């Protein structure tokens, strides 16, 4: 893991402002192997510049065979992956996916505790933390296994993202209004999304990767 740490971009557990993505095809090309469009990113767009650094660091950490597999994905898949990543503002150069998933579990449990104790603030805060969970070192793809880096396989991420992150935001909004009944009703949808994603992508040894340098 020390080599992974040394090769990633500087700074650990960095927190960035949410990114407004207006040219998804440009960003996808930037992330997934085309240097031609790098110059189209405006220099004064600090959010875009930070995202560029993060994504270049993720690509650099991938072993060559994974880099080639990722570059071969369709534009639609690349744009989907970028749209998911752009929803997050916490990127780590230390945490593995296993560690991130433990954080997600803790946030889920905090949501349940908040609902059971009728604490709208605890519930909403935990739900928003879950929705904006940390992205692990190297990004998400290295932990999914080479066999899953295909257009068909990755297409299901959209539904899982809506089930987990999307419903977590809805749960937070319901808690903000004091509507704990609606908040509670969303727990099942969130957990179903988690279980479904695990069924598709979780490897034999969860949360680790042999596809990082």
Question: Which stretches of residues belong to each language-model region?
Answer:
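Bacterial N-terminal signal peptides
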Residues: 24-35
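Sequence context surrounding c-type heme c attachment/ligation sites in exported
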Residues: 44-213
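N-terminal secretory signal peptides that target proteins for export/translocation
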Residues: 1-19
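Sec/Tat signal peptide C-region and signal peptidase I cleavage site
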Residues: 36-43
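Cleavable N-terminal export/targeting peptides
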Residues: 2-3, 26, 39
């Amino acid at each position: 893991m020390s080599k992974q740490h040394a090769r990633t971009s500087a700074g650990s557990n960095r927190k960035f402002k949410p990114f407004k993505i207006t040219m998804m095809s440009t960003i996808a090309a930037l992330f997934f192997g085309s240097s031609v469009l790098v110059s189209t990113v405006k220099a004064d767009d600090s959010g875009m510049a930070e995202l560029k650094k993060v994504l270049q660091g993720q690509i650099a950490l991938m072993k060559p065979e994974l880099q080639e597999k990722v570059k071969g994905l369709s534009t639609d898949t690349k744009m989907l992956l970028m749209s998911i990543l752009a929803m997050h503002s916490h990127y780590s150069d230390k945490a593995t996916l296993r560690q991130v998933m433990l954080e997600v579990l803790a946030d889920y449990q905090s949501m349940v505790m908040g609902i059971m104790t009728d604490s709208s603030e605890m519930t909403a805060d935990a739900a928003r933390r879950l929705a904006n969970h940390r992205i692990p070192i190297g990004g998400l793809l290295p932990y999914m296994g080479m066999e899953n880096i295909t257009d068909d396989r990755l297409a299901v991420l959209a539904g899982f993202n809506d089930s987990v992150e999307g419903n977590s935001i809805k749960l937070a909004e319901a808690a903000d209004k004091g509507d704990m009944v609606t908040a509670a009703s969303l727990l099942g949808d969130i957990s179903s999304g988690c279980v479904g994603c695990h069924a598709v992508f979780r490897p034999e040894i969860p949360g680790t990767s042999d596809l990082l340098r």
